[in-house]
C-alpha cells in the first residue's frame, strides 16, 4: 500500500513544537535567536538486551551509561528547539524563513526518524488534501520513496549517535544530574540562549578532546560510567518513587529540581 503526499503550506506542523536537534543544528537555531532546551529521561538498564533486540539497540546507541544509587541506567539526552505558537522562522505567508538551513526533522516531515514508529498519516498535522492520490508517492509499505528524505533520515540518525559524548558533556556543563524515569516524562533544562550556546560549545570541545586523548569510539565513551556520579530519577508518582527505592535507586519528586530545571510529566501527579 502506498501513501501520496505533498505539503500544502498549511503551517500546522510549524506551531507549538519541541523539535529534536543535533548539536550543530542547535547552535544555528540559537544563532538565529531561537530557544534551545535539554530534555532528559533515564531508562533502567539492569542487563544488556539480546543482540537481536533492535529496539533496545536503538535506545542504547542514543544514550549513555550512568548509575542512580546502585541501579544501572541509560540517560537519554535530547536537545530541542522549543516554541509556543508559530515557529519563529514561520513567515506571514506561511513559508519557512530558514528553509535553506532548517533542521533535518523539518526536512523529512512527515516521515519518521525512529524506525520503530510506524508511519501513520492520521498521526500527522497535515490536512486531508495533503494526502490526495494526485500527489507523488511518498511511502510504500514503510519505505520512503524520496532519496533526499532517506538521506536526511540517515544523517539525523547518525547525529543522534555521534552527539552522545558531547550531550553527556553538556549535562556536565549545565550541572544536570536529574532525569525523568523513561515513559513517565522529561526533566527539562532551560538555561537561556546565551548559557545554552556557551555550554554546547564547551561540551563539543570537551567531547572532542576526550575522544582524541582516549582514542576511543563514541560507543565506548557512552558505555563508561562516571566514577562517583549518581543520577536522581524524578517522578511525580509516589508509587514509582517507592519502587525505585526498593532497587536502591535515587529518586525525588519534581519539587526537588533546581532552577532552571522543570518536569514535564506524562501522567497526573499521585501521592498514593
Spans of features found by a protein language model:
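Short loop/turn segments that flank or connect secondary-structure elements
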Residues: 1-272
Amino acid at each position: 500500500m502506498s501513501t501520496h503526499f505533498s505539503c500544502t503550506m498549511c503551517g500546522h506542523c510549524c506551531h507549538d513544537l519541541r523539535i529534536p536537534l543535533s548539536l550543530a543544528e542547535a547552535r544555528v537555531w540559537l544563532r538565529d535567536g531561537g530557544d534551545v532546551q535539554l530534555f532528559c529521561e533515564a531508562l533502567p538498564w539492569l542487563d544488556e538486551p539480546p543482540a537481536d533486540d533492535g529496539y533496545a539497540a536503538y535506545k542504547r546507541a542514543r544514550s549513555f551509561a550512568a548509575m542512580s544509587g546502585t541501579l544501572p541506567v541509560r540517560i537519554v539526552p535530547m536537545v530541542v528547539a522549543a516554541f509556543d505558537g508559530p515557529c519563529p522562522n514561520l513567515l506571514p505567508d506561511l513559508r519557512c524563513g530558514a528553509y535553506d538551513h532548517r533542521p533535518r526533522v523539518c526536512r523529512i516531515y512527515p516521515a519518521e526518524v525512529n524506525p520503530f514508529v510506524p508511519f501513520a498519516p492520521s498521526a500527522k498535522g497535515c490536512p486531508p488534501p495533503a494526502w490526495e492520490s494526485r500527489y507523488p508517492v511518498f511511502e510504500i509499505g514503510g519505505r520512503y520513496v524520496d532519496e533526499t528524505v532517506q538521506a536526511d533520515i540517515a544523517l539525523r540518525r547518525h547525529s543522534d549517535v555521534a552527539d552522545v559524548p558531547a550531550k553527556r558533556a553538556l549535562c556536565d556543563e549545565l550541572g544536570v544530574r536529574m532525569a525523568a524515569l523513561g515513559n513517565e516524562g522529561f526533566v527539562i533544562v532551560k538555561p537561556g540562549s546565551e548559557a545554552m550556546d556557551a555550554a554546547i560549545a564547551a561540551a563539543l570541545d570537551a567531547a572532542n578532546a576526550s575522544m582524541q586523548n582516549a582514542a576511543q569510539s563514541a560507543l565506548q565513551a557512552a558505555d563508561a560510567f562516571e566514577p562517583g556520579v549518581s543520577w536522581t530519577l524524578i517522578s511525580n508518582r509516589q508509587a514509582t518513587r517507592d519502587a525505585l527505592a526498593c532497587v536502591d535507586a535515587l529518586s525525588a519528586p519534581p519539587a526537588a529540581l533546581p532552577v532552571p530545571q522543570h518536569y514535564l510529566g506524562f501522567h497526573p501527579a499521585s501521592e498514593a
